[in-house]
Amino acid sequence: MDRVADALERLRIISSERFRPTMELAWPRIVTGFAIMSKQTADLAMVGMAVGIAGTGGMAFALAYWEIVTMLGLGLAGGTVSLVSQNYGGEETERASLVVTQSVLLATAIALPLVATFLLFSEPLIAVFDSDPALVEHGSTYLVYVAPAVLFELLNLIASRTYTGVGDTFTEMVARAGGAVLNVVLSAVFIFAFDMGVAGAGLGTTLSTGFVTVVLAWGMVGRSYGRLGMEPSPVPITRSGPWLDLGLAKQLVEISAPEIGRRLAQGITVFPLLWIAAAFGPVVVTAVEVGRRVRSLINSINWGLGLAASSLVGQQLGADDEDEAGAYGTEIVRLSVVIYVAAASVVVVFAEPIAGLFVSGPEEVVQAAAFVAVGAISAVGFGLDGTAAGALLGAGDTRLPFVASLVGRYVFALPAAALGFVTPLDVAGLYLAFLLETYVPGGINYWLFRRGRWKAVSRKYRPSAESG
């Protein structure tokens, strides 16, 4: 690690004294992100082997709705990590604990209607994309079985971001990685041993996600994990209360709402993209989803570096050190781009064998490999976007990143995808959309960070603002 730190410092990417705390926070989150993203990726591959294109196509449609759940949770948890890190960094632990309590209550209020919607309206939700009976059957079945996991996943995201905000990414890594392994094992048993198909994938996800909730809840109420090496939360949820602080709740909503909007703008884009892909047939639908899943695995790097940027920038601002906060943000962005370029290069080289893990026919492999390669290249834009937006989030500056997300995805990416209908671009319009949806918001958010307006925004959220 020391040699790597020294080499990166000589290359003027990141100083060694900032690299160490960054990676101490980031590497467990990267493992966590990879574990979380690998669940649906492994499920998609197993369904492809057991059921075929109809199964993967229907599951692709269902996973679009699951992505909305994830984006809602990430947006809300973005407000959590921003306020927890600033208050914890300013030694206001009781106030940070109250942020967590209110985040849990809000997450539950959001989750319950979504659970009911998945259970009651699964078939109409899938039919939005395609009326093919086989696709609708497989997609709606997955939604029904995965519905209870909606509540579990939102609570898990709040717990994970709480641990990140206080500088502990090891505890959530152990819980999340254990849940991911359990998910793969359960899904494999249900899909292959019990011949449950997509239902087995959904059931495996629900049971494993619930397991993670139980594990994290133990520490979130301040209980010790014994000799496991995991730590109880230093800002625990308590029964004694208080349960509500209107001023703090307003700040949580104020920071989270634009971040939820930014995340939803990112997640909702997949709906018209899949609708356009459906016009080219189930092979293209599956190829798009394979490309997105592989890109999401690469983007697990952002789970670590993006959250490290939020936490470290937030903690430095909580201590009223704006210069150090700026230095952390700038250098983490540079580090992210370097790592993403390296990871994307490897995936592009091995795009065809990677595609072969999900599909088997020659035409299917060629199409999926193209989307795997394009997805890998577009992931570099995610690296820029995630760390720049993460640094802004640590300061509580979430409104303009939300606008950047809208512009990139709805002004650039979707029109590019639609060009396939009216020009000879055909499927290449979807390739272009993959690239624009990450590089445009990434470039805008990096420019916003370089402007420095976020420093002024952060001053009204710091503990010193309350006492002042």
Predicted features by range, described:
Residues V47-E67, A134-G139, V198-L203, L248-I255, ...:
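Interfacial/gating helices of multi-pass transporter permease domains
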Residues I13-A50, A64-G79, L83, T108-V115, ...:
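N-terminal transmembrane alpha-helices
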Residues R29, G33, L44-A45, L63, ...:
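Transmembrane alpha-helix boundary and packing residues in multipass membrane permease domains
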Residues T56-A116, E153-E172, V285-S345, V349, ...:
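Small-residue-rich hydrophobic transmembrane alpha-helices
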Residues M1-A26, V84-A149, A193-S256, V313-S378, ...:
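Short alpha-helical transmembrane segments in multi-pass integral membrane proteins
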Residues T70, L74, T141, Y145-T164, ...:
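Short runs within selected transmembrane alpha-helices of multi-pass transporters and secretion channels
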Residues E24-L44, S208-V212, L216, M220, ...:
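Transmembrane helical elements of multi-pass membrane transporters/channels
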Residues S38, A50-I53, N87-G90, G165-V166, ...:
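Helix-loop interface residues and adjacent transmembrane-helix termini in multi-pass membrane transporters
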